[in-house]
Amino acid sequence: MTMEILLVNDDGIYSNGLLALKNVISEEFDANITVVAPTNQQSGIGRAISLFEPLRITKTKLADCSEGYAVSGTPTDCVVLGVHQVLKKVPDYVISGINIGENLGTEITTSGTLGAAFEGAHHGAKALACSLQVTTDHLKFKEGESPIDFMNTARIVRNVFKKFIDDEFPCDVININVPDNATENTPVEITKLAKKMYSMHVEERIDPRSRSYYWLDGYPIMDEEDGTDVYAVRNKRNVSVTPLTLDNTAKNLDEFKEKYAKKF
């Protein structure tokens, strides 16, 4: 049976990572792939939606001359419009990526790549998010085409996808992170989220009128515990596969109830 796949990202519709993933998946599977992605770079936007401005959908041509839909909004907007306006149905899968830069640890809540995947799961689709580690900072937020070769990563994502395709989906979102030097022979490790991916840093600068302005930055954390996504990708150089859920309820709900319910 032909699968219906909605392909999105947060790096913009002309990203090489999105195109590589589209081409590799279309070669392997019997699938209708619809690309709906932001017109512009949307990294760090999380699961934000546009409430105070109208959205536009523009048909466009990707680098391989196939058709895509550019949305003047966030990755989550792309999923919403993809489901309700472009496809007019919930696809079998929402796949988000390939992101330029890893999405690890609890900071995934800031990721537009993960935001789109969670929105897909919220609509009832099976969802995957996939990201490639990038150690060259100036490439991480590049808009449009990039000199990075995404084909190895696309094949790795395809191989991981194949493991789940015939099974009941085990979670809401599968988060795949690929080390920058990975090949199809790189080990795949099932992981949990690390506490932190970056140590936050704020850089203050002064503008020509002597007023302060700020850049938010961070330093990569390497010393997370074994078994986490950060340790798998950055220390062991393994592909990380992390099952995620939309339900943010604390794991210790019963303990919380027992301790606090009588206080209300």
From Swiss-Prot:
Cofactor binding note from Swiss-Prot or TrEMBL: Binds 1 divalent metal cation per subunit.
Catalyzed reaction equations: a ribonucleoside 5'-phosphate + H2O = a ribonucleoside + phosphate
Keyword hit for Metal-binding: yes
Top-level taxon in the UniProt lineage: Archaea
A GO CC annotation given for this chain: cytoplasm
Residues holding a divalent metal cation: 10-11, 43, 99
Cellular localization per UniProt: Cytoplasm
Enzyme Commission number(s) from the entry: 3.1.3.5
Top-level class of the enzyme under EC nomenclature: hydrolase
UniProt xrefs under Pfam families: SurE
Required co-factors: a divalent metal cation
S-S bonds: none
MF terms (GO), sorted A to Z: 5'-nucleotidase activity; metal ion binding; nucleotide binding
Keyword terms of this UniProt record: Cytoplasm, Hydrolase, Metal-binding, Nucleotide-binding
Function summary: Nucleotidase that shows phosphatase activity on nucleoside 5'-monophosphates.
NCBIfam families: PRK00346.2-1, surE
Family in the record: Belongs to the SurE nucleotidase family.
Protein name as annotated: 5'-nucleotidase SurE
Species in which this protein is naturally found: Methanococcus maripaludis (strain C5 / ATCC BAA-1333)
Gene: surE
